[in-house]
Curated annotation (Swiss-Prot):
Protein family membership: Belongs to the selenophosphate synthase 1 family. Class I subfamily.
Keyword Plastid: no
Keywords, comma-separated and alphabetical: ATP-binding, Kinase, Magnesium, Metal-binding, Nucleotide-binding, Selenium, Selenocysteine, Transferase
Cofactor binding: number and manner: Binds 1 Mg(2+) ion per monomer.
Annotated catalysed reactions: hydrogenselenide + ATP + H2O = selenophosphate + AMP + phosphate + 2 H(+)
Protein name: Selenide, water dikinase
Residues the entry annotates as binding Mg(2+): D44, D83, D219
Length: 336
């Protein structure tokens, strides 16, 4: 099997441009919008209303996160669909974007990536309408996705209020595990649990979030848990108190980060939030909380009275959840 991870400098969402750099790139632009534009740049996806239908649009493309091309295609697809779910939408159709070195890699590898993507799209009942390919030395695959909000409402990062609970639906640490895989320290069978979680769609988490009348939501991916939590805080003009011992993560990721094995994106993410961070935690814990996750879970806020129904609802929907903290008045990230 070709080691896809050896063909790229960074893997998965760890290859994203850091949040600080992205902020600098977009600074000062006057981006055109019209009266139908409900959400533009700055959230997980764009939202646009047309003929009474609320549409959600996003694009996500990643480098390999595993060496198996089928799994990479499926994980990349789940990752791309996630932003639609985070906005409260349901994906409808998609366009594929693929960068592939067809001079050096067997075409069957490319076909396996597509097969993985098609199977995941079928699971999500999302139609592939076409796509675009580029001959490129570093392989990349992803999707541009369009979805709708059938309930007639959408969720953004800006609705959280003081005194609410922070809910997370998948463990963190995948970026660190992928780094271990890329460095040859781990094998794919060592991270089977993480692979299964990356493959899992966020459709059930979306249904849980809506059932609990979530006030704000994002998906935890390349900017890390702290980076995405800060986006909710910044956009909602509140703060958050996160309890490290309540945050789910893979034990192997702790082992690796203590050995200084983690993607550089974790440090970029931590630097992005350091001016808003209040914490006396060990540095390895903060790095883990800043890990650039691929195909992570949803992070959302709910009123405390919703606790009465969260267990029953999550059980009915067959989705995991963890209460990792609460929102506070001070516009900071307090990590205990």
């Amino acid at each position: 099997m070709v080691e896809l991870l050896k063909l790229v400098r960074s893997s998965g969402u760890a290859a994203k441009v850091g949040p600080g750099d992205l902020q600098e790139i977009l600074k000062g632009f006057n981006i055109y919008t019209d009266e139908s534009t409900l959400v533009s740049i700055g959230d997980d996806a764009g939202v646009y209303e047309h003929n009474g239908i609320i549409w959600v649009y996003t694009v996500d493309i990643i480098t390999p996160v595993v060496n198996d091309p089928y799994l990479w295609g499926a994980i990349s697809t789940a990752n791309a669909l996630s932003d639609v779910y985070a906005m409260g939408g349901i994906p409808v159709n998609a366009l594929a974007i693929s960068c592939f070195n067809n001079c050096e890699l067997d075409i069957e590898i490319f076909r396996e990536v597509i097969r993985g993507a098609l199977d995941k799209l079928r699971e999500a009942k999302t139609v592939l309408l076409g796509g675009h390919t580029i001959d490129d030395k570093e392989p990349k695959f992803g999707l541009s996705v369009a979805g709708i909000c059938p309930e007639g409402k959408y969720i953004t990062q800006s609705g959280a209020q003081v005194g609410q609970l922070l809910i997370l639906t998948k463990p963190i640490g995948t970026g660190i595990l992928i780094k271990g895989l890329k460095e040859g320290i781990l094998k794919e069978e060592d991270i089977n649990e993480a692979i299964e979680n990356m493959l899992a769609l966020n459709d059930k988490a979306r249904n849980l979030m809506l059932s609990l009348d979530a006030t704000a939501c994002t998906d935890v991916t390349g900017f890390g848990l702290l980076g995405h939590a800060w986006n909710i805080c910044k956009n909602s003009n509140i703060g958050a108190r996160i309890f490290f011992e309540k945050v789910p993560y893979y034990q192997l990721s702790e082992n690796l980060v203590k050995k200084k094995i983690y993607p550089k994106g974790a440090i970029e993410n931590l630097n992005f939030v350091k001016n808003y961070l209040k914490s006396n935690l060990d540095n390895w814990k903060l790095i883990l909380l800043s890990d650039p996750v691929t195909s992570g879970g949803l992070l959302f806020t709910i009123n405390k009275e919703k606790l009465e129904k969260i267990d029953e609802t999550a059980k009915e929907l067959e989705v995991n959840y963890w209460i990792i903290g609460e929102t506070i008045a001070e516009n900071v990230l307090e990590v205990l």
